[in-house]
From Swiss-Prot:
Residues 356-431 form the AGC-kinase C-terminal domain. Residues 98-355 form the Protein kinase domain. Residues 58-93 are annotated as: Disordered. It is found in: Cytoplasm; Nucleus; Endoplasmic reticulum. ATP binds at I104, G105, K106, G107, S108, F109, G110, K111, V112, K127. Its EC number is 2.7.11.1. InterPro entries: AGC-kinase_C, Kinase-like_dom_sf, Pkinase_C, Prot_kinase_dom, Protein_kinase_ATP_BS, Ser/Thr_kinase_AS. GO terms for biological process: apoptotic process. This is Serine/threonine-protein kinase Sgk1. Protein kinase that may play an important role in cellular stress response. May be involved in the regulation of processes such as cell survival, neuronal excitability and renal sodium excretion. It catalyses: L-seryl-[protein] + ATP = O-phospho-L-seryl-[protein] + ADP + H(+); L-threonyl-[protein] + ATP = O-phospho-L-threonyl-[protein] + ADP + H(+). One of its GO terms (cellular component) is endoplasmic reticulum. The gene is sgk1.
Amino acid sequence: MTIKTETEKPALTYSKTRGLVELITAFMKQRRMGLNDFIQKLATNSYACKHPEVQSILNLTPPQDPELMNSNPSPPPSPSQQINLGPSSNPSAKPSDFHFLKVIGKGSFGKVLLARHRTDDQFYAVKVLQKKAILKKKEEKHIMSERNVLLKNVKHPFLVGLHYSFQTADKLYFVLDYINGGELFYHLQRERCFLEPRARFYSAEIASALGYLHSLNIVYRDLKPENILLDSQGHIILTDFGLCKENIEPNGTTSTFCGTPEYLAPEVLHKQPYDRTVDWWCLGAVLYEMLYGLPPFYSRNTAEMYDNILNKPLQLKPNISNAARHLLEGLLQKDRTKRLGCKDDFTEIKNHVFFSPINWDDLNAKKMTPPFNPNVTGPNDLRHFDPEFTDEPVPSSIGCSPDCALATASIKEAAEAFVGFSYAPSMDSYL
C-alpha cells in the first residue's frame, strides 16, 4: 500500500497514512540466532554443499555453477525453489537474474523495484514481498489470489501484465510490466483536479478494465488513485490485485470487510453481502475525486467519514456537466440494488451519456490519444515517481536469498503456504 505525504495546501488535500503500521511491521528486520547462524555458514560453503549428507540436511541440489556461486552474492538455490510448485513452476528463476536499480514503490509486505534483466536487458517492475510479514498477517490467500488474477490479466490493455513469478526461502517475486508514467494519485496531488474530458478518458479506461475483470468473475475491491498508473503514453494501467475476489458469478456476493476507507461502499461498511457493484461505487468515488480534488464523503475523522458514506446525501457542486452529475449520482447510489451497473454491469456504464464521446473499440485498441502525455524519455526517467521511494537505497538482500533460515520451522511453513506461486509463460506465448 502506497504511503504518501500531504501537499502544502491542507484545505485541498487529505492524509493517506493508512497502512503505516503494516508497512513498518513488514520491513522490520528479522532476528537470526543460534542454529540459523550455523546453517548460514554451512549453506554458503560451496565445498560443504557438494557433500551428499549436507545436501540431505539442507535439501539442496548440487551447485550447477561453482564459479558463479563464488563470484555472485546470491547463495545456492533454497528449498522453496526445489519444492513441487505445480505445472507452471519456474525453478530456474532467481534474484541474481536481475540488476535492481531503484526503489519505485512500497506496500504493506514489501517493495517494488525497477530492475533490468541481465540476459535480455529488458526493464521490469519487480514486486518483492516478505513471506514472514505475509504469514504474520495471514494474507497468503490474498497473495496467491493476486498471482492468479495477474495470470488472467496479461492480455488486457489496461491491466498490468505478469511476466513470471518465483520465490526464494524468504521472499516472493512478481516480475511485472514496468510502468513509469506515475500514479494517478501523484498527478492529482500536483494538479488538484482534472478537467472533465481528461477525467472521462481515465474513467472510461478504468471502467473497461473493471468490466473485463467482472467478465472473469473477479471483483477488484480496491480501486483508488494509488492503484491506477499511467503508462509512458498516458494510458491507464490498473495494478495491485491483492484484494481481488475470484469466482463471483454475476448474481454472486461476498462479505469480507476490505478496501480503503475513503472508497468503501455503504454495504461494505454495513458488513452486508456485496457484489460486483462495489467496484462501480469505487469508480464513482475516483471520478468524483478527479473532478473535485477529494473523495465524495471525505473527512479527516474516519468515524465521521464512515457516517458520511452511510448517511450523508451526495453533494455535487455546479461546475460539472449534467451528464457527469447524472453518472456520479448513479455510481454513488447508496443502495446497491439501484446503483448503475446493478443489472447489466459494464454495459450500463459504457452506454451512459457521459461516455458518448468515447469510441470503445478505439479506446481498447489504444487508438484514442490520451489527454496527458507523461513525456518520459526512457526507462530510467523516474520523474513521475515519488522521491520518497527513489531516494531510498536498494536493500542488498533484495538480490539474494539468505539461506540462514533454511532449517527453521517458519520457512518450512512459508514454503508450504506458497506452493504453486512460481510461474513462467510457455514458449508458445513468445511465438
